[in-house]
């Protein structure tokens, strides 16, 4: 699948700071410690609607991860999937009397446009679930052969399931108790009440064909893959395990990331799936999480169509810490526009106060669990001083501009 074009990332003078990031599995902020090549997997969209600000917040958070790693001299091998066949996509296509393939292609194309406009660094591999079906089937065959998968005793729909206890470490990523798992499993695409399962928490690997649904003829039967096995396969096919970081929104902690890891670990026998699990908070509107199901969405494409500078969107979302659930408000949006104007005015000055200490502080803040509020405050202070009092350093405005571009992805 075609990815989008990445902006260039300028080289910044001075000493970088290594990235320490909150790990969901341990509950600690700890070093990411990649090797020469940092390996990142972030779960992509289910393309049945346009990119909203909740999506943008997640992908911008992991864009910062890439930028800090690049600043530290790492190559970054970034993989992202597209869930281009799944129940929400099929349901939306049926509701709107649309062809599900056309809908998926249209929304995936719009997502790429939005990411490019937001100056998000593109993944090296951008992989759809549909194109991955042969590899997914091979993975399920191996899980069946090893006893880490089973078929339902159902003459009509003998679906294939993954026993949640197939690995000894199930639950290590989310650290949830069974009651919480059951609740979230039911809320987030699971089927705890499916008759014939060995346990309510067992997860679907292969759904046998139903009337009116897309399906593929394979060695394990005609059907389509479950959600979690798609990411397991795509990550295993493109990244050595354990890779450095598995990322996504906080609504993916369970069940998606827990099962993706369990599927892969059951196949390979290698634990953990990823060395680090990081999750971005939700963006709210009118007191509710912004989501397609609720319909309380602010779309990136709609903002762009009204002439909103993508830098304003980035700054508005960076005003809060990436792990926090936070609201989108008109005040936040206005403050971001004011901030961008201040920074651009300061970057256009012929000289200013020394900027190296400020850049060092920005690096320190971003290296400490992507603390963007403190990073933005440090840059604000320099820009105000430069505008109000000036300074003798003729290189400072240019270095300021470079730092904002390299570390925050904002073109001044």
Swiss-Prot record:
Motif stretch ('ERGGDP' region): 187-192
Record flagged with keyword Nucleotide-binding: yes
A GO molecular function held by the record: ATP binding
Motif 'KMSKS' region, residue range(s) on this chain: 289-293
Cofactor descriptive note: Binds 1 zinc ion per subunit.
One Pfam family of this chain: tRNA-synt_1e
Catalysed reactions listed for this entry: 1D-myo-inositol 2-amino-2-deoxy-alpha-D-glucopyranoside + L-cysteine + ATP = 1D-myo-inositol 2-(L-cysteinylamino)-2-deoxy-alpha-D-glucopyranoside + AMP + diphosphate + H(+)
Residues bound to Zn(2+): 43, 231, 256
CDD domains membership: Anticodon_Ia_Cys_like
UniProt EC number: 6.3.1.13
Cellular-component GO terms for this entry: cytosol
Keywords tagged on the record: ATP-binding, Ligase, Metal-binding, Nucleotide-binding, Zinc
Source organism superkingdom: Bacteria
Functional summary from the UniProt entry: Catalyzes the ATP-dependent condensation of GlcN-Ins and L-cysteine to form L-Cys-GlcN-Ins.
The protein's assembly and partners: Monomer.
Name of this protein: L-cysteine:1D-myo-inositol 2-amino-2-deoxy-alpha-D-glucopyranoside ligase
Organism: Actinosynnema mirum (strain ATCC 29888 / DSM 43827 / JCM 3225 / NBRC 14064 / NCIMB 13271 / NRRL B-12336 / IMRU 3971 / 101)
Gene: mshC
